[in-house]
């Protein structure tokens, strides 16, 4: 059913969920790989995972990546295509590929940031290898050769683009949670449409022990906010702000999120910030809104399952009704972690 979140100055209306990729029907799973990027008005690429339903109960990336193109803001999609780099890597047997984030440059170039994992451990997708980048200049018809975009092992958790510059944040740790001082969050930038990346900074959070997932968002004033997941305090999201596009940072008090947050994903739509991800203890799918990217509301549950699901991503699109946030996420269809890929639309209605 649809959900309405009421606030003094606005309401957020979230449509009913729709199945985007029916993995149950094809007896597969869809862990990770929810990247999307709009490379022309109303035209975007949407990635998803096609992975084993039995390895780690469906909660691994043992498989390959698919993608579809929509040219009408998500009303219809092309037939699925397998991402060649992911298929070749899988068949070679050295590592598997996920597309954690993708961005579209002003000239229409699609930049896909790819994670690599060995197939040697069954649990999820660790250890992480160094990330790779591939590009398409023809709307996903063909792809460049992959190259190592960051020399540190780890997981790129987020990438955003502003004024033609791509900003990417990686947690430099081949495993999930931080355990030592060298496990830090680094911010990289590309000023040539993803052909190369340079390090800008290390986000100076004083302690990254038991930290993992992270997210970034630019606010309306042009400040860049960074957030990190704290396993020890899932209702306190580490927060830092940069006033110079990621070169330097000010660490602030953690943001309080009443229902907890894992896998935080952020967006800005019609002047309202949106935060969504798994709730505390790996249960439920929760959505928060804020007017300043700091003070978040009490949170609203979008789903109440537990298990290896509710990994998500989002993209702001526009149709005849105005802007909407397309949220893509995984949801259980069987067992602990066999998941379909789902879509929901969130719209903001201003009351003023």
Question: Over which residues does each language-model region extend?
Answer:
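Asp-box/BNR beta-propeller blade signature and adjacent active/binding-site loops
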Residues: 1-352
């Amino acid at each position: 059913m649809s959900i309405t979140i009421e606030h003094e100055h606005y309401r957020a209306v979230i449509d009913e969920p729709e199945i985007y990729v029916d993995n149950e029907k094809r007896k597969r799973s869809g862990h990770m790989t929810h990247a999307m990027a709009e490379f022309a008005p109303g035209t975007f690429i949407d990635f998803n995972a096609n992975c084993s339903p039995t390895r780690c109960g469906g909660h691994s990336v043992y498989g390959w990546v698919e993608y579809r193109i929509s040219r009408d803001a998500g009303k219809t999609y092309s037939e699925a295509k397998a991402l060649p780099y992911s298929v070749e890597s899988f068949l070679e047997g050295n590592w598997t590929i996920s597309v954690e984030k993708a961005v579209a440059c002003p000239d229409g170039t699609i930049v896909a940031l790819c994670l690599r994992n060995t197939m040697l451990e069954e649990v999820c997708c660790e250890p992480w290898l160094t990330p790779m980048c591939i590009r398409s200049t023809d709307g996903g018809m063909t792809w460049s050769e992959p190259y190592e975009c960051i020399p540190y092992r780890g997981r790129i958790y987020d990438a955003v683009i502003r004024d033609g510059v791509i900003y990417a944040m990686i947690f430099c740790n081949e495993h999930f949670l931080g355990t030592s001082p060298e496990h830090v969050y680094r911010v990289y930038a590309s000023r040539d449409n993803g052909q190369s990346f340079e390090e800008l900074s290390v986000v100076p959070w004083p302690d990254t022990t038991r930290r993992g997932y992270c997210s970034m968002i630019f606010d309306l004033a042009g400040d860049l906010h960074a957030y990190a997941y704290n396993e020890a305090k899932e209702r306190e999201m580490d927060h830092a702000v940069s006033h110079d596009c990621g070169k330097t940072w000010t660490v602030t008090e953690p943001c309080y999120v009443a229902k907890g947050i894992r896998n935080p994903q952020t967006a800005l739509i019609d002047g309202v910030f949106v935060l969504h991800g798994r709730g505390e203890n790996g249960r439920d799918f929760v959505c928060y809104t804020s007017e300043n990217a700091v003070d978040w509301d009490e949170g609203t549950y979008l789903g109440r399952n537990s298990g290896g699901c509710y990994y998500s991503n989002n993209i702001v699109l526009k149709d005849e009704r105005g802007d909407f946030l397309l949220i893509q996420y995984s949801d259980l269809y069987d067992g602990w972690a066999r998941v379909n890929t789902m879509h929901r639309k969130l719209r903001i209605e201003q009351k003023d």
